[in-house]
Structure formats: C-alpha cells, structure tokens
C-alpha cells in the first residue's frame, strides 16, 4: 500500500494512457466506418460556419482541425474523443486532490468514472456530448478556485469565461452547469453573505458574451434554427398532460439504471454506508451544486415542459460524482482494504471494451458497418471517367453526403441544400447530389448512378 501511495500520479498516468490506447484501438480495429455523429460533424466542418441546423459549431471545428492534419484517417477521430475524455479525467483528478487532500482518494474518484458508460463505451463517437467533457471539467475546476481562494485571480475568471463559452458552443445544455454555478455564488453572496461580491466576476460574463457574439449573430440571421431543432428533439410539439409525469419518471429511472455499476463500486469501496452530511461544509455544498443541481434542473425542465430528456444528453453531468461520493464516505474508506474495489474496477474497465468489440464484430447492420470509403471510391472512379473538373460540393443528408465529403480526395464542401446558394458556388466546381434514387434519376441533368440503394447525381464539366 505504501508503494501504491507513493506512485499515485504514475498510476493515474498509466490509467489514462491505457484508457486512451484501448478506446482508440478497439473501434479502429472493429469499425468499418466512423459513427453517425462524427460523420455529421465532419460534414459541417467541411463548410465551417458559426453554427449549424442541429448544434453550435465547436464539435465541427475541432474535427475539421484534425481533418486538416490527418485527413480521412478514422483512428485520428477516435483518438480525439479519448483526448477529450482524459483531459476531463485530469481536471477531475486535480479538483479531487484539492478537495480530498488524499491522493489515493483522488485516484479512486477517477476510477469510479469507469463504472459510468458515458466515459468509456459511448466515447468512440466524437459528438457534441463528448465535446463538452473537457470544458465542463475545466469550468468546474476554475470555479472551485474562485469559490475557495480568498484572493480571486483575474486569470481564473478569464479561463472560466473562455471555457464556459467553448462549452456552450459545444452544446447549449452546458448552460445547466453554468446556471448551477451561478446559483451557488448567488446563494453565498446574497443569502449566506459569507462571500463578498467581486467585480472580477463580471470579467467572466464579459469574456463569455464576447466569445459567443459571432454565434449569437449567426443564430439571429438563421431564424434560431439550432434552438428550434433542440426543442423539436424534446418532443414539445406533441406533449400531453401525461408527459409531465411520464417523461420525468422515465428520466429519473434511467439515471438510476445508468449509475448501478457506479453504486456497486461504491458498495465495494464502503463496507458500511453511514451518511454524515454537514450542510455547513463549503466543500460539500460546492460538490452538491455542481453534481446534483444540473441534474435536478433537467428533471424540473422535464416536469414543467413535459419534454423527453434523451439519455446521451447527460454525458458530462456525472463527471464529478466520484469526487462527491468519495468525499461523503471518506471516513468509512479503509485504504488498506481496497482489493474488492480494485477487482470490481478492473472487471468493469476491461468488460466495457470487450462488449464494444463483441457488438461491433457480431452485429453487421450498424452505421459503423457502412461502406463509406468504398462508395466514395466508386463515385470518384465514375467521376474521373466522365468529367474533367474536381468535385467541390456534395449535397444531401449528413450521413450519405457527409461520408462522401469525408472520404473523397478533394474534400468537397457539404450542403444540406444549395437552394439560394447557387450564386455563391464556384461555377468550375463539380457537384454530387445524394438522395432517393427514384427521384434523382428523373431530375438528374448529369450522370446518374445507384449504389447501395442510394442515388447519386453527378454534375461536372465534360471533356
């Protein structure tokens, strides 16, 4: 155990490297195509803007940066996901060290996250949920510094504002964390009056708003399409009175189900669970606000609006659950008797990639089995036989047209539709439309083809 104690930082590094290697290799070796959300964001990235019809721009931006470096190499995007995950683990570990003052407990706080499938099984698909993770953890970490330290550093305020903006530009649900942190400070400044208001707090807001301005302008100019999509996904248009009860209950039960492996590890860690909660403990109050309040606000949203909260939306919400539960039960954890916990952790750590591997190999009708590269090769070969110019644009849904944009050598820009955009396109550029083969065949003015039940209309310059 002394060796274990002395080498905690080394163990943490080994753990995150193993996590990164395993969760980069397994999907790389078993998936034929990138997942839907990753292809979708890559499609947006081919034609970067300050927002898109479904989400803000951050996830597309990070993927496009990587594409410019590595091109259509699938492993790079699985690696990107894991980099985002281990950055979040790092800041969880850092905060745990500051709050728990015990490096072994801090390591356990991170190990517990391997029991939540949001941080392993679902991470190969880089999307807006994974994109939030590092910014969620960084905002919490620097918010703690502002909350805990007697002297507020300007640097910390700037960092909170900056990373809060990037988190919000990843997904609007990041706002639930920001509201929770705001309520924490409001509680202590205006009700408990144990924290004095500091004008440096305004720096956070100013940095946040300045960084959001381009997106807010884009949002206004595009009829708030991203917000409309988000509301549509909640099913608000067809809500009934029963939904105000049904969906919150479903939401609550799903969260319990997700956390069952986590609670099993807690039971293995703490032999006799005795709750001793001191609501005057500022560390505990901070952890409650950043862990439970965002989830509670989601539950209230579902109750008030009758909206359906989708499971994957909760991806970043549990990042600091390990820190909270270890803090609550720290006096009941015997660090000399961790064997059962470590066995449970190792079992879950290796079970998750094994299950992913099995599902990926045994099921052959998934999005990740799509022959995107082969289809792009066929399209490119046919294009070369019929046209002399380069494919500069692909038009269609994010999946079929997005795969073409990703796999074609020319990296054409993706458009859902080019209606009202014709004047902005390069007249020398070739266009490939994807869609319903029966419709495309009738209206295609160029070369029509059909691959895997999908129609392709190619319009370019002839010899």
Which residues fall in each region the model found?
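Transmembrane-lumen/periplasm boundary regions of multi-pass, lipid-linked membrane glycan transferases
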Residues: 166, 178-283, 294-295, 299
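Membrane-interface alpha helices of multi-pass inner-membrane proteins
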Residues: 47, 156-172, 183, 208-210
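Hydrophobic/aromatic-rich transmembrane helices and adjacent perimembrane loops
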Residues: 47-48, 303-337
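Signature aromatic-anchored transmembrane alpha helix within multi-pass, membrane-resident enzymes
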Residues: 331-359
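Short periplasmic/luminal acceptor-recognition loop of GT-C membrane glycosyltransferases, typified by
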Residues: 178, 365-422, 427-434
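Membrane-interface transmembrane helices that cradle and orient dolichyl/undecaprenyl
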Residues: 98, 139-156
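Short acidic/glycine- and proline-prone juxtamembrane loop motifs at membrane-interface regions
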Residues: 121-132
């Amino acid at each position: 155990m002394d060796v274990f104690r002395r080498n905690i930082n080394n163990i943490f590094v080994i753990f995150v490297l193993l996590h990164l290697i395993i969760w980069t290799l397994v999907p790389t070796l078993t998936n034929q195509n990138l997942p839907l959300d990753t292809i979708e964001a890559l499609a947006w990235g081919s034609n970067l803007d300050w927002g898109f019809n479904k989400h803000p721009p951050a996830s597309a931006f990070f993927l496009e940066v990587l594409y410019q470096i590595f091109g259509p190499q699938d492993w790079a995007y699985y690696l990107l996901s894991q980099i985002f995950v281990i950055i979040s683990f790092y800041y969880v570990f850092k905060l745990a060290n500051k709050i728990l003052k015990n490096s072994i407990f801090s390591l356990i706080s991170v190990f517990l996250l391997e029991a939540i499938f949001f941080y392993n099984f679902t991470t190969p698909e880089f999307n807006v949920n994974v994109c939030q993770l590092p910014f969620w953890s960084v905002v919490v970490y620097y918010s703690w510094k502002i909350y805990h330290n007697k002297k507020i550093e300007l640097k910390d305020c700037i960092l909170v504002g900056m990373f809060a903006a990037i988190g919000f530009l990843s997904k609007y649900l990041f706002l639930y964390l920001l509201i929770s942190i705001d309520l924490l400070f409001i509680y202590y400044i205006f009700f408990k009056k144990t924290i004095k208001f500091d004008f440096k707090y305004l720096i956070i807001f100013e940095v946040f708003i300045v960084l959001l301005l381009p997106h807010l302008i884009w949002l206004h100019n595009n009829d708030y399409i991203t917000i409309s999509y988000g509301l549509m996904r909640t099913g608000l248009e067809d809500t009934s009175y029963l939904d105000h009860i049904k969906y919150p209950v479903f939401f609550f039960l799903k969260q319990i189900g997700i956390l069952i492996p986590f609670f099993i590890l807690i039971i293995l860690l703490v032999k006799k669970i005795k709750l001793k909660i001191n609501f005057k403990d500022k560390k505990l109050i901070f952890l409650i606000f950043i862990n439970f309040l965002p989830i509670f606000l989601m539950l209230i949203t579902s109750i008030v609006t009758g909206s359906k909260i989708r499971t994957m939306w909760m991806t970043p919400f549990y990042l600091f659950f390990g820190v909270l539960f270890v803090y609550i039960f720290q006096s009941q954890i015997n660090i000399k008797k961790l064997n059962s916990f470590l066995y449970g952790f190792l079992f879950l750590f290796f079970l998750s990639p094994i299950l992913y591997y099995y599902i990926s190999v045994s099921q052959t009708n998934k999005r990740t089995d799509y022959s995107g590269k082969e289809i792009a090769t066929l399209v490119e070969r046919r294009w070369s036989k019929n046209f002399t110019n380069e494919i500069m644009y692909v038009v269609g849904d994010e999946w079929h047209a997005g795969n073409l944009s990703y796999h074609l050598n020319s990296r054409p820009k993706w458009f859902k539709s080019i209606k009202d955009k014709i004047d902005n396109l390069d007249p020398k550029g070739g266009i490939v439309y994807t869609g319903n083969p029966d419709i495309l065949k009738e209206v295609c003015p160029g070369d029509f083809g059909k691959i895997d039940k999908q129609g392709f209309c190619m319009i370019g310059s002839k010899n």
